[in-house]
A protein has these predicted regions:
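Short catalytic/metal-binding and nucleic-acid-binding patches
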Residues: 1-145
Length: 145
């Protein structure tokens, strides 16, 4: 286990019905999701997670080399299981290991503005210089927009 991977896991707590902002990254930041088809594989996996009631997605953006995902964790699964399932499904479909180990998570506190967090997430393509308007980027969703 790499030194930073252990620090990613320290203090991690999974709580049902908690809203989380998760970020997971491709191995060596390879822009594998620049491919429309590959990006849609991630989106399909996120939707499946919702359909199985593991999560309730509030917002996401699939960037060329990472994913931001804001969701409410269901009561049947642990946070690490949900992330592992998403990563595994996409890896199997692509046919090769693509993910950096671990992920970053932030449990949203009651006093945090969830809509502003969603705006931050979906504005990622603008900040990265990929598009001028959010609507021009195809791989995002937010329940408020």
């Amino acid at each position: 286990m790499l030194k930073h991977q252990k620090s990613l896991r320290m203090g991690r707590f999974s709580q049902a019905n908690q809203i989380y902002h998760i970020t997971f990254t491709t191995k060596n930041r390879v822009p594998i999701f620049k491919s429309f088809a590959n990006a849609r594989l991630v989106i399909h996996a996120l939707k499946q997670s919702d359909e199985l009631q593991h999560t309730n997605t509030l917002a996401f953006v699939v960037m060329p080399d990472h994913v931001h995902w804001l969701f409410d964790l269901g009561s049947k699964h642990q946070l690490h299981q949900v992330v592992k399932t998403i990563k595994s499904k996409v890896t199997i479909k692509i046919g090769q290991p693509i993910w950096q180990a671990g992920y970053y998570d932030h449990a949203i506190r009651k006093d945090e503005d969830i809509v502003n967090i969603a705006r931050y997430i979906i504005a990622n393509p603008i900040r990265a210089g990929l598009v001028k308007k959010v609507g021009d980027y195809p791989h995002w969703h937010a329940i408020w927009l």
